[in-house]
Amino acid sequence: TALVLALVLLVCLAAGCGKKKEDNVSGSSEVKKPVMIKVGASVTPHAEILGVAKELLAKEGYTLEIVEFNDYVLPNTSVEDGELDANYFQHRKYLADFNEENGTHLVEVVPVHYEPFGIYAGKTKSLEELADGAKIAVPNDGTNEGRALLLLEAQGLIKLKENVGFTATKLDIVENPKNLEIQELDAAQLVRALGDVDLAVINGNYAIQGGLNAGKDALAVEDKDSEATQTYANVLAVKEGHEKDAGILALAKALQSEEVKKFIEENYDGAVIPMF
């Protein structure tokens, strides 16, 4: 009898220990760390910068999948629909305007860089040579058109309605001494259009993609201390409620790392400027 009791006791103890160990394993498994982070990005410079972050994240146990886009809509709708975890392609104002116009719920996580807008030569090779009735191409989306027109105003080429700011369109031009013809084109087509217009005001990423550099090739660029620097900072964005996800925080940290800062400064010659 004593032997039977001893055996029962040993079995119970073993079962208890096993359960306790099982509970501990179960408890530790509740700490979830996503392995895959899927991010949408413009090809240049965003996907290139993410390539540096990808290496840093790999050391933390994350796999970063970079999905490249050539438009400004799908990267946002894909995050909203849950097809992507985040995106990195747009500036603050575009993000705010997109949410308002489309009823999406996207939020900024961190700013990463700033791309100065530039005025680039087409048929006309300098601002001084600009003839009466010259054609100037600008982005046709509301967010970037205002920014382009403000740069033209800063160069004394046009004058806009007072306090119209970044919402300006060509309809807000009140003075146009050279009778410039403002052509609104898709931002992605501006570099290709240079052969057909006198000048074009081009987004930083599309300029780089087209082999142009704001620091070297532009006839004029936005002032580094202008309001545009903050307003148009390019950000990492996610759907609201996911800002504190472990993978997103790891990605944000990688994008604001010294390695990324060094990569930007060494590879873009002033066409891309880190915001950290």
Name every feature range the model reports, one short phrase each.
Residues E80-Q90, A134, L157, K178-E181, ...:
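Alpha-to-beta junction loops
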Residues V109-I158, K261:
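A conserved helix-loop-strand patch within extracytoplasmic ligand-binding domains
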Residues K32-T44, Y62-E68, K135-I136:
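Short, well-ordered beta-strand elements
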Residues I66-T77, V164-R192:
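Short helix-initiation/N-cap motifs at beta->coil->alpha
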Residues P116-L127, Y232-D245:
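A bilobed periplasmic-binding-protein/Venus flytrap-type ligand-binding module shared by bacterial periplasmic
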